[in-house]
């Protein structure tokens, strides 16, 4: 069997994607471990300027509501949850607020939700 010409590294590709998203001046990265080292999300933001990162407390519903507000103001928040099971705690703001905005108005908010399953 032939070896592939190159190998993809998940961490490197995720870091590259976050760096690409950061090129847009209205993109903000919101979540835990965005400004302070400690978990994998910090490592993947190495190409993102600190002024585009917002550190949040452990309050997932607050984080999703905050991102909804940022989107209403024209920003493109990337809401980062360290693990997928924490996303369950943000479902109220996601399903009852963010999801309804387009139906209640002509506005289409842009929010990117990023979470991880497994380890990097």
PLM-predicted stretches and their roles:
Residues 1-120:
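Thiamine diphosphate
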């Amino acid at each position: 069997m032939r070896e592939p010409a190159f190998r993809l590294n998940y961490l490197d590709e995720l870091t590259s994607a976050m760096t690409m998203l950061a090129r847009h001046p209205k993109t903000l990265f919101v979540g835990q471990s965005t400004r302070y080292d400690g978990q994998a999300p910090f490592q993947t933001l190495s190409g993102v300027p600190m002024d585009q990162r917002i550190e949040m407390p452990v309050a997932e519903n607050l984080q999703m509501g905050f991102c909804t507000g940022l989107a209403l103001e024209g920003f493109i928040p990337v809401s980062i949850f360290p693990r997928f099971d924490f996303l369950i705690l943000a479902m109220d703001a996601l399903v009852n607020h963010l999801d309804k905005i387009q139906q209640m108005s002509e506005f289409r908010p842009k929010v990117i939700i990023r979470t991880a399953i497994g380890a990097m």
